[in-house]
Amino acid sequence: EIVLIGSRSAGRTAIDTPVPVDVIDVVELAAQGPQTTVNEILNYVAPSFTSTTQTVSDGTDHLDPASLRGLGPDQVLVLINGKRRHKSSLVNVNGTVGTGSVATDLNAIPAAAIAKIEVLRDGAAAQYGSDAIAGVINIVLRENTNELNLMVNSGANVSKHSEQYDEGGMDGERFQVSANYGLDLGNNGGFINFTGSLENRGATNRSDSMQQPIFTMFDTATRLLGYDQAFA
């Protein structure tokens, strides 16, 4: 027999909460917008959330550091169904967002597996510890059973600056398919939920050729001397 005689946090409603908590319905949002990852969804609806997709930046190409209120990625606590989610094993050592910190990999959780996301946009270090200085993100997973949810997303960038064709065209093609299904376990409300997601993201190139000479017949000293004479 286990008797609970105390708790660090008392139960309260949204009205009793002294700090703002954003509740994001991922199922409804996914049906309205093109956001396909947790970072993109939170960037779209949470004003204090920041996540930037990195390029040519070691492991942060796949693990996008996320932050709240402009603080470090290691100061954001991520919970899964109210339980603490572990940090990733990647240390940001390049000149990217959150250099020197260790963030939580939100991309490891498919958006199709999430029912809603709760974002506490204030410090909660007194309750959760120093890794909640910036705020807390609680991800609530789906609990549905005997129901198949299938989602397909596709898109691309259409621009005259695309170098795929001489006159412009499309690049950055993106395709994602995800599925979620749950099964009942036993007769006491148990269940198991499966989610799979596959994404293919193409490259985007906005570079152009340089149409002017890099080196000229005049060296730096001659050019500076000419300016000195002109303004003398």
Predicted regions and their residues:
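Extracytoplasmic beta-strand/coil segments of soluble accessory domains associated
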Residues: 39-89
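Short acidic/polar hinge/loop motifs at secondary-structure boundaries
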Residues: 83-121
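N-terminal periplasmic "start-of-domain" segments of outer-membrane beta-barrel proteins
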Residues: 2-35, 39, 60, 89-99, ...
